[in-house]
């Protein structure tokens, strides 16, 4: 099972990472835990919109096993998960390793490592 976490006091972590100084001033909270049908390996880049929603991908899992695109929406009691797309690994692609990018209109864009209509894996 994968978990998406929130790092509290993120600014000090960023500064610490740049200066290579260690500290223990941060804590983490699990904000969502993925089950297999919701996706597996949620270790890709995340994107946020102006409403505070978090978007990302899982490399595997989902309805067809080829990975997913998901949205997490903040609520008063936590985070609500929405499965936006489940890849088949066929012509629609699969294994979206790099997450998504969101444009000004709210459209999501991303790439997949496998599948597609071409004849070679990883793109031609």
Where are the regions that the model predicts?
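Extracellular beta-propeller repeat domains
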Residues: 2-124
């Amino acid at each position: 099972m994968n978990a998406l976490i929130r790092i509290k006091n993120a600014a000090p972590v960023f500064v610490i990472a740049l200066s290579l100084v260690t500290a223990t001033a941060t804590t983490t909270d699990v904000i969502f835990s993925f089950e297999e049908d919701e996706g597996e390996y949620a270790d890709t880049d995340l994107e946020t919109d102006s409403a505070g929603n978090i978007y990302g991908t899982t490399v595997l899992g989902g309805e067809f096993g080829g990975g997913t695109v998901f949205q997490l929406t903040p609520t008063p009691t936590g985070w609500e998960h929405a499965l936006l797309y489940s890849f088949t690994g066929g012509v629609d692609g699969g294994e979206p390793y790099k997450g998504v990018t969101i444009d000004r209109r709210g459209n999501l864009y991303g790439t997949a490592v496998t599948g597609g209509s071409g004849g070679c894996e990883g793109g031609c």
